[in-house]
C-alpha cells in the first residue's frame, strides 16, 4: 500500500485520509468493518505472479495505523478456524487470505451469514482499499453474486493501471454496484434506519 512497500499501489497513499475517516466510524461504534488482509508465507504460490509481500510476522503484513482499530478479530484462512457466534464486541473483522480473493477463505461465508442475521435487508457493503482491479473487484463481485448491495467508495480505492481500474468500475456498476464518495458513505450512517418485518 505504502511507497517503498513490496507491492506498492502508486497513488494509494492519497486515499489514506478517507480510509481513516471510514475506519473512524468503526472506532466510534457506528459500523462494523469487514476486511481482508494478505498473510503470506515466504514460499507462497502467489509469489509466482506477484513479488513477495505481506509476509506474516513482518512489518509489511501489518495494517496501516489509519485503518487499524482496537477491537479486531482476525480469522485465519483455515477450514477449522472458529468464527464466534457473537461478533458484536468487535469493531473490525479481518479475513486472512493468501490469494487475491477473500472468498477463498472458507470463513468468509460464515461471517456473511452472521451479518445477514443482524442487518436490515437494505444493508450495503461500502468497499474501499487497493487494488481496484484485483482484491477490490473480487470482493465486490463476490458480494454482488451473493445478493448483497455494494457501493465502491471512489475516493478510497486506487488502481495499479487506470484503464484496468476504469474497466473494473464499469464491470461492477453493470452488475449493480454503486459509486459513492467517502462523504456519502458517512452520511448514510447518519440516516435513521427502519427495519421491515
Located regions from the model:
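Internal catalytic-core helix/loop-beta-alpha segment
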Residues: 58-130
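Glycine-rich anion-binding loop/nest that anchors nucleotide
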Residues: 122-138, 152-157
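Active-site acidic carboxylates
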Residues: 1-91, 149-152, 160-197
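Short, small-residue-enriched loops and turns at beta-alpha junctions
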Residues: 101-103, 157-161
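Histidine-anchored nucleotide/phosphate-binding helix
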Residues: 19-25, 134-145
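Residues at alpha-helix caps and immediate loop-helix transition turns in enzyme cores, especially N-
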Residues: 107, 139, 164-165
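Active-site donor-binding loop signature of nucleotide-sugar glycosyltransferases
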Residues: 97, 155, 182
